[in-house]
């Protein structure tokens, strides 16, 4: 892979003569059940990366890491545009356009993409990964270990760019975010994700929940992890509190939102002990009762 001459402005080529010699050597290829980019789910599917034999030595000691960054060359991408309308943005006007360096669109001058993935297992030169959003046959240009000490920035925030396609899409996104923080998908985590999904879709019109204060049951550790992750509340900043009652409370602007467990006589922990798939399958009216109250200034 070399940079095509017609993609290099003449003034840039004269000032930086080395730029035309930039070369990317594919080190492997993606093997995925999805071959059409239009059919790829937002968060990808289980896939594998086959490293070419001549790069096998580069995999030595990769087993020390649970997650990796996969850098790929999006060979089907449009390299001619610098402005795009991101997924989820309904405004087709100039106001809806974003620069390609401000979004994760495959459209960009150098279509290098990166995705973090969990290593399920390594078989020879084949990496089996929990999910990749690259289509079958995508060239891989690099593999790097994911380091918690330098790659995880828990204080990072992003202004919302687009609107989730629907409630299910939002729930899937929240579950993945919470699982990345907590380490596994359990009942308590799923319960927390369902509460936050309802809160955002019903009361916030799908907007992000950053800046929300939360009060959570003190004995529901997995649910606490979900709420911390998904609304950005923490004890250290005074935005996360605890109590002994079976309900979650969100406080935002001039309103209070209560989520009360709908199973009288049962402890909250008995719900969170259920498997995640059970929590996700139950109708929300069987899990909680939600209400919103205006807080009047005194």
What do these predicted regions represent?
Residues 165-185, 196-298:
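Non-transmembrane, aqueous-exposed alpha-helical and coiled segments at domain scale
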């Amino acid at each position: 892979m070399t940079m095509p001459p017609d993609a290099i402005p003449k003034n840039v080529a004269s000032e930086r003569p080395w730029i035309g010699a930039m070369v990317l050597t594919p080190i492997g290829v993606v093997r995925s059940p999805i071959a059409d980019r239009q059919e790829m789910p937002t968060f990808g599917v289980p896939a594998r990366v086959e490293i070419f034999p001549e790069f096998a030595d580069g995999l030595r000691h990769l087993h020390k890491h649970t997650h990796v960054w996969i850098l790929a060359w999006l060979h089907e991408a449009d390299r001619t545009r610098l402005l795009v309308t991101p997924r989820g943005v309904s405004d087709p006007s100039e106001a809806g356009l974003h620069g390609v360096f401000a979004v994760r669109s495959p459209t960009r001058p150098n279509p290098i993409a990166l995705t973090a993935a969990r290593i399920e297992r390594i078989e020879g030169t084949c990496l089996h990964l929990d999910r990749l959003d690259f289509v079958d046959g995508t060239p891989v240009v690099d593999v790097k270990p994911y380091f918690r000490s330098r790659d995880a920035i828990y204080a990072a925030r992003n202004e919302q760019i687009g609107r989730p396609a629907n409630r299910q899409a939002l729930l899937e996104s929240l579950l993945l975010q919470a699982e990345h923080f907590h380490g596994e998908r359990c009942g308590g985590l799923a319960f927390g994700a369902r509460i936050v999904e309802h809160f955002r879709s019903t009361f916030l019109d799908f907007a992000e929940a950053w800046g929300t204060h939360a009060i959570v049951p003190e004995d529901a550790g997995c649910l606490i992890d979900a709420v911390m992750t998904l609304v950005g509340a923490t004890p250290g900043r005074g935005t996360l509190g605890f109590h002994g009652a079976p309900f979650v409370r969100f406080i935002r602007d001039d309103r209070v939102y209560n989520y009360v467990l709908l199973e009288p006589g049962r402890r909250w922990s008995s719900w969170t002990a259920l498997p995640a798939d059970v929590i996700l399958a139950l109708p929300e009216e069987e899990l909680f009762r939600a209400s919103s109250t205006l807080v009047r200034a005194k």
